[in-house]
């Protein structure tokens, strides 16, 4: 889960090497996969059509993010 109370938690004090960026991207992908799992669980936990539509849309956007991050990793590798 994110560190929302600390507004500086995501700041990086220096430029990352490609190896460090690759590791960070793996962590980002992990977060996206967790979000997909949670949105999908919420989707299946409701019968409200509007909620289901919105949750499915958000879940599917996260899947796109995973693909984009993997594409970036392939580019950097």
Task: Enumerate the language-model features and the residues they cover.
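Non-heme di-metal
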Residues: 1-77
């Amino acid at each position: 889960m994110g560190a929302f109370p600390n507004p500086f938690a995501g700041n990086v004090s220096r430029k990352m090497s490609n190896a460090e960026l690759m590791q960070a991207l793996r962590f980002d992908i992990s977060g996206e996969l967790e979000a997909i799992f949670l949105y999908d669980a919420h989707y299946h936990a409701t019968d409200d059509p509007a909620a289901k539509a919105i949750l499915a849309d958000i879940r599917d956007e996260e899947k796109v993010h995973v693909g984009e991050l993997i594409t970036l990793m392939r580019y950097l590798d």
